Amino acid sequence: VSLTDEEIRLIQHIWSNVNVVEITAKALERVFYVYPWTTRLFTSFNHNFKASDKQVHDHAVNVSNAISAAIGDLHDINKNFSALSTKHQKKLGVDTSNFMLLGQAFLVELAALEKDKFTPQYHKAALKLFEVVTEALSCQYH
């Protein structure tokens, strides 16, 4: 998956106009409730999976920082996510399908937040972003 310059511009515009930690926390909460098996990776959260819970918020900060860094350098994302991919594979044992589940949850949250501003062009660009992120986070699995 590759992004056009226009899609990168749209992604940067979307990301700069939302509270990235808040939307990430909401996306994480959605994943935890819609796909409950994903919570097995977060036993330290003590079954507190709401966006407002401290552990979810703290993880949202980490995730949003990683996505923000990716958006800042989309042309070299595999290199930039190499260590994170290794951590998710070897240390945490994360199934790569979970990355796309989070991406889909982001799309829902962005659409709910942006409403009419979340045009088909924005949707396509955001979807491709999360496909690129998923590929990058999965690069050390192969």
UniProtKB/Swiss-Prot annotation:
It comes from the Eukaryota. Belongs to the globin family. Involved in oxygen transport from the lung to the various peripheral tissues. CDD domains: Hb-beta-like. One of its GO terms (molecular function) is oxygen carrier activity. Red blood cells. One of its GO terms (cellular component) is haptoglobin-hemoglobin complex. This is Hemoglobin subunit beta-1. Heterotetramer of two alpha chains and two beta chains. Heme b binds at H59, H88. Residues 2-142 form the Globin domain. Keywords: Heme, Iron, Metal-binding, Oxygen transport, Transport. The gene is HBB1. One of its GO terms (biological process) is hydrogen peroxide catabolic process. Pfam families: Globin (PF00042).
